[in-house]
Amino acid sequence: MRAPEGFLLGGIKREGIGVGLIFSERRCAVAGTFTENTLRAAPVEHSEEVCDRGVARGVIVNSGHANAMTGEEGYQDVLRTAEAIAELMGAPEDEIVVCSTGVIGERPPVDKIVRYAREVWEDIGPTERHVREFSRAIMTTDTEEKIALYEGDGWSLLGIAKGAGMIHPNMSTMLAFLLTDVGAKPKELQMWLRDVVNDTFNMITVDGDESTNDSVVLLANGSSNLKVGSDVTITEFQRALEEVCTELAEKIVRDGEGATKLMIVCVHGASNEVEARRAARAIASSNLVKAALFGENPNWGRIGAAVGAARVDVDPDELRIAFRSSEGEIVTYEGGPVDFDEEKAKRVLSASEVEIVVDLGVGDASARAWGCDLTYEYVRINAEYRT
């Protein structure tokens, strides 16, 4: 595994502070999607402005301090950081994306972050080691790295993400960086990214809490000398984006704080896509459903209640609810309660990956969402961690 052509990465973690750098040897077209939380962090405001201009040269990420709800001082910290990293990279400061993750209400120690960034810069590179060092540097409560790679014919797309708690994006803390060496226009990148994020990152939930710092950034530097639309088909590039983002989204949920099971919610038979998405997210977000999954309890009534609470069109006489895993499938409701084998249901739900399949019985639209179970360990982690 290597970074796409022309990208260099690195990272360091020390004294509870992580610093990661991404640098492109060529200027990049850039696109981004960001949290809709009304108390957005200062770096989100800055990075969205960079993405709106459509050109970037580098990224700095710090973990440990979210720099959210920190007022004007926090925004000045972002500008100071961007200025220092721009000087380091030999780029304009308005081409530096700045991202932060960590404790809300805490300003970042800019001088220390810049000092660590200079150390990272001395050993920045494209190898698997450099990619993994960046990935580890941006982690907070994560227990696993989240990396995905798509390799095309003469080009590639690398995705690196972090996130384990406060995951209920609308684009937890969730950060994702997508790097490709194909060429593309910023407006096209923004359109493709928005569509893919809506079907992947915006359909995951760990705890229903939307962070102040959620950011997904896509950088395309054209170093492969291949362009989307002429050398690489738009269809293939969109497929690559979807595959990488889907893999990252699943890894985030699988690594949810305290999680023991990945939940995949598949909703079919909805009247339209909006309602399918709403129903899928409602099920994946339900604490009662998540707790039942942890207990390996086939409590289909909680799923039905979540669907009803989503205010979507559903035909009770056609409604179907089933659980599916590597251990088999069990139907629990089909126009009415179904007598099922409780022992088989327990086996189906004992798997580490469980699908909840729901047919609303009113149309042809479908959607998919990802979630995880709710465990005692989640409560312990968040009782002790200051968000």
UniProtKB/Swiss-Prot annotation:
Its EC number is 2.3.1.35. SUPFAM superfamilies: DmpA/ArgJ-like. It is found in: Cytoplasm. The active site is at residue 173. Its main location: cytoplasm. Pathway: Amino-acid biosynthesis; L-arginine biosynthesis; L-ornithine and N-acetyl-L-glutamate from L-glutamate and N(2)-acetyl-L-ornithine (cyclic): step 1/1. One of its GO terms (molecular function) is L-glutamate N-acetyltransferase activity. It catalyses: N(2)-acetyl-L-ornithine + L-glutamate = N-acetyl-L-glutamate + L-ornithine. Keywords: Acyltransferase, Amino-acid biosynthesis, Arginine biosynthesis, Autocatalytic cleavage, Cytoplasm, Transferase. Pfam families: ArgJ. The keyword Transferase applies. One of its GO terms (biological process) is ornithine biosynthetic process. The record marks 101-102 as: Involved in the stabilization of negative charge on the oxyanion by the formation of the oxyanion hole. Substrate binds at residues 140, 162, 173, 257, 382, 387. InterPro entries: Arg_biosynth_ArgJ, ArgJ-like_dom_sf, ArgJ_beta_C. CDD domains: OAT. GO terms for cellular component: cytoplasm. NCBIfam families: ArgJ, PRK05388.1. Belongs to the ArgJ family. Heterotetramer of two alpha and two beta chains. Catalyzes the transfer of the acetyl group from N(2)-acetylornithine to glutamate, forming N-acetylglutamate and L-ornithine. This is Glutamate N-acetyltransferase. The gene is argJ.
